[in-house]
Amino acid sequence: MIRRLAAFSALSGLATAWLPEVNKKITSTNGTNLFTSSNGKIRGVNLGSQFVFEPWIAEKAWSDMGCGGQKSEFDCVSRLGQANANSAFASHWGSWITQDDIAEMVSYGLNTIRVPVGYWMREDLVYSDSEHFPQGGLQYLENLCEWASDAGLYIIIDLHGAPGAQTPQNPFTGQYAPIAGFYQDYQFEGALKFLEWMTTNIHQNDKFRNVGMLEVVNEPVQDAGKVGSMRSSYYPNAFKRIRAAEQSLNIDRNNYLHIQMMDRLWGSGDPNESLTDTYYAAYDDHRYLKWASVAVSKDSYISTSCSDQLNSNTPTIVGEWSLSVPDNVQWNSDWSPDSNKDFYKKWFAAQVTAYERQQGWIFWTWKAQLGDYRWSYQGGLLLTRPGIGDQQVLTL
């Protein structure tokens, strides 16, 4: 179905795109293949709050930027003014995720990063009289992708913040919008222009050489009846526009980007409903038992995760998940992270085992300022040190 390509060369003229090990082997600059120990499965982390800041993740960093009390990037830029905001966000972009972070991820056996970005990274799409977002992020995205590519990490770029906001009152869209304004033709057009632009950057800039997947929108409204236009118009046009951009660059079909959508289980309908071509389509599911209709007990969480089949569109990557439990119990003695490490190790193992029945997993998130490893892969690492490939860790 998909032929295996020759080993990746970091010195190739145009960057390429693929699923690692399925379509192509990739290595770091020193020749290490991070996917060997995972049998090709994706084992990754999200870089939450790097380019789309979610204040709940890092309240101190948010306050230090001068954004304290603001709900979203839009609100902070409005408050600080463009020039001051650009300076504050540049400082954040240069310090939140560093090259040392990338090296640490590799040392823990991870092989993939998912990078949430907003459409405003293409700055000519922003209505400057009514939209307020930081400027200058592309340079920092380039640097990050170069570090990750040199380290041999696979990279997924995710349109986390869509024009008009794809869901209301949520800072992960970059704004705290009262309604989901994304589901209109002119907003779709803005997102499509972003996808074309990002596709061209990925293929023409060698710093993006390990970007193999582009997610066209993160977490749309979970009501299939309200987002029919996304399935009938936006998804098919995203495929057409991305492929047209690749064809204009004479990219070989085997080097196309995988185009990722939320899967049917997410609740926004079947993403394939109006697609006429699913070549190099990929799918994303987010699995937070914290908010699921599951009995709140340790046995229930373990058994649910052990039996989780996630039968849906394929190939599916579980692109977000965590170890957090419901707010009303999360700091009780029965659930506190400090006194229940053995349970959380077992639950971690149960989840990754289930998700590797699919294409793999990406934990939310790499780092946070919560003092809680249930949301921060870096923050405890009692779970994975010295590496996720350690069979002792993965045994229930």
From Swiss-Prot:
Q: Does the keyword Secreted apply?
A: yes
Q: Where in the cell is it found?
A: Secreted
Hydrolase in keyword set: yes
What GO biological process, any one, is recorded here? glucan catabolic process
Q: Which UniProt keywords apply?
A: Carbohydrate metabolism, Cell wall biogenesis/degradation, Glycoprotein, Glycosidase, Hydrolase, Polysaccharide degradation, Secreted, Signal
Gene Ontology cellular component terms for the protein in this record: extracellular region
Superkingdom, natural source: Eukaryota
Give me the reactions it catalyses. Answer: Random hydrolysis of (1->6)-linkages in (1->6)-beta-D-glucans
Report the active site residues. E219 (proton donor), E320 (nucleophile)
Position of the signal peptide: 1-17
Primary location group: secreted
Q: What is this protein called?
A: Probable glucan endo-1,6-beta-glucosidase B
EC number(s) on file: 3.2.1.75
Q: Which residues are glycosylated?
A: N30, N272
- Native organism is Aspergillus fumigatus (strain ATCC MYA-4609 / CBS 101355 / FGSC A1100 / Af293) (Neosartorya fumigata)
Role of this protein? Beta-glucanases participate in the metabolism of beta-glucan, the main structural component of the cell wall. Acts on lutean, pustulan and 1,6-oligo-beta-D-glucosides.
Q: Could you tell me one molecular function GO term of this UniProt entry?
A: glucan exo-1,3-beta-glucosidase activity
Instruction: Give the family from UniProt.
Output: Belongs to the glycosyl hydrolase 5 (cellulase A) family.
Q: Which gene encodes it?
A: exgB
Taxon lineage? Eukaryota, Fungi, Dikarya, Ascomycota, Pezizomycotina
